[in-house]
From Swiss-Prot:
<dbReference type="InterPro" id="IPR001353">
    <property type="entry name" value="Proteasome_sua/b"/>
</dbReference>
<dbReference type="InterPro" id="IPR033812">
    <property type="entry name" value="Proteasome_alpha_type_5"/>
</dbReference>
<keyword id="KW-0647">Proteasome</keyword>
<dbReference type="GO" id="GO:0010498">
    <property type="term" value="P:proteasomal protein catabolic process"/>
</dbReference>
<dbReference type="InterPro" id="IPR023332">
    <property type="entry name" value="Proteasome_alpha-type"/>
</dbReference>
<dbReference type="InterPro" id="IPR029055">
    <property type="entry name" value="Ntn_hydrolases_N"/>
</dbReference>
<dbReference type="InterPro" id="IPR050115">
    <property type="entry name" value="Proteasome_alpha"/>
</dbReference>
<dbReference type="GO" id="GO:0031012">
    <property type="term" value="C:extracellular matrix"/>
</dbReference>
<dbReference type="GO" id="GO:0043161">
    <property type="term" value="P:proteasome-mediated ubiquitin-dependent protein catabolic process"/>
</dbReference>
<comment type="subunit">
    <text>The 26S proteasome consists of a 20S proteasome core and two 19S regulatory subunits. The 20S proteasome core is composed of 28 subunits that are arranged in four stacked rings, resulting in a barrel-shaped structure. The two end rings are each formed by seven alpha subunits, and the two central rings are each formed by seven beta subunits. The catalytic chamber with the active sites is on the inside of the barrel.</text>
</comment>
<keyword id="KW-0539">Nucleus</keyword>
<dbReference type="InterPro" id="IPR000426">
    <property type="entry name" value="Proteasome_asu_N"/>
</dbReference>
<dbReference type="GO" id="GO:0005737">
    <property type="term" value="C:cytoplasm"/>
</dbReference>
<dbReference type="GO" id="GO:0005634">
    <property type="term" value="C:nucleus"/>
</dbReference>
<dbReference type="GO" id="GO:0019773">
    <property type="term" value="C:proteasome core complex, alpha-subunit complex"/>
</dbReference>
<dbReference type="Pfam" id="PF10584">
    <property type="entry name" value="Proteasome_A_N"/>
</dbReference>
<comment type="function">
    <text>The proteasome is a multicatalytic proteinase complex which is characterized by its ability to cleave peptides with Arg, Phe, Tyr, Leu, and Glu adjacent to the leaving group at neutral or slightly basic pH. The proteasome has an ATP-dependent proteolytic activity.</text>
</comment>
Length: 241
């Protein structure tokens, strides 16, 4: 007996006859726009902060967060879901540092995030807690380790991939095309900032300002991240074409 479309919609671990998991697809639809660009010097993350009301305080919306001093993450999607994942990643990195007296590798951190992302669905025979649906958030994880700067993308399906430059969320198809045309491994960190914001500017519905965009960098020289304040962000925006 075949299931109806609505039953496939509700089933978080039931594939449709076309091989689709609708709950994962719905989670992907919740993702907004974010861009990451990696070069030899470090990684740049730029994320749109969509303000739904003029009464909203822009500083209360945080789209780039710290996982560890050498790891940052741009989140796109449901913030409550992202908080659960980020808290998990922070615990994993601190446990690794406590046990091995060294910072956790970027890929290892991403792997732990994606392991958590896969824990959804019915929980009949396991003692572990699970989400009843996929996490509605995608992440761009940037970090520095012994391999140098790296940029990873993870989506609600629990898949992760390493990129030199990546756009996620609404309008990401056009943004990714721009990145493919203009990206070069020889870019400096300043040029990566400009490329990320220029690409963001092209696909955003509103004019880019210091209140609707968040910019962060993590550099190999400093081995730590920096989130730009309004004055620093305004200086970079002024250089855009």
């Amino acid at each position: 007996m075949f299931l109806t479309r609505s039953e496939y919609d509700r089933g978080v671990n039931t594939f449709s006859p076309e091989g689709r998991l609708f709950q994962v697809e719905y989670a992907l639809e919740a993702i907004k726009l974010g861009i990451g660009v990696q070069c030899e010097e470090g990684v740049v993350l730029a994320v749109e902060k969509r303000l739904t009301s003029p009464l909203l305080e822009p500083s209360s919306i945080q789209k780039v967060v710290e996982i560890d001093y050498h790891l940052i993450c741009a989140l796109s999607g449901l913030v409550a879901d992202a908080r659960t994942i980020i808290d998990h990643a922070r615990i994993e990195t601190q446990n690794h540092r406590f046990n091995y007296n060294e910072p956790m590798g970027v890929e290892s951190c991403v792997q732990s995030i994606c392991d958590l992302a896969l824990r959804f669905g019915e929980n009949r025979n396991s003692g572990e807690e699970r989400m009843s649906r996929p996490f509605g958030v995608a992440l761009l994880i940037a970090g520095i380790d012994e391999k140098g700067p790296s940029l990873y993308y993870s989506d609600p399906s629990g898949t992760f991939t390493q990129f030199h430059a990546k756009a996620i969320g609404a309008g990401s198809e056009g943004a990714q095309t721009t990145l493919q045309e203009k990206y070069s491994k020889t870019l400096t960190i300043a040029e990566c900032q400009k490329l990320a914001l220029t690409t963001l500017k092209q696909v955003m519905e509103e004019a880019i300002t210091t209140t609707n965009v968040e910019l962060a960098v993590i550099t190999k020289a400093d081995q730590k991240f920096k989130i730009y304040n309004k004055e620093e962000l305004a200086t970079v925006i002024q250089t855009l074409e």
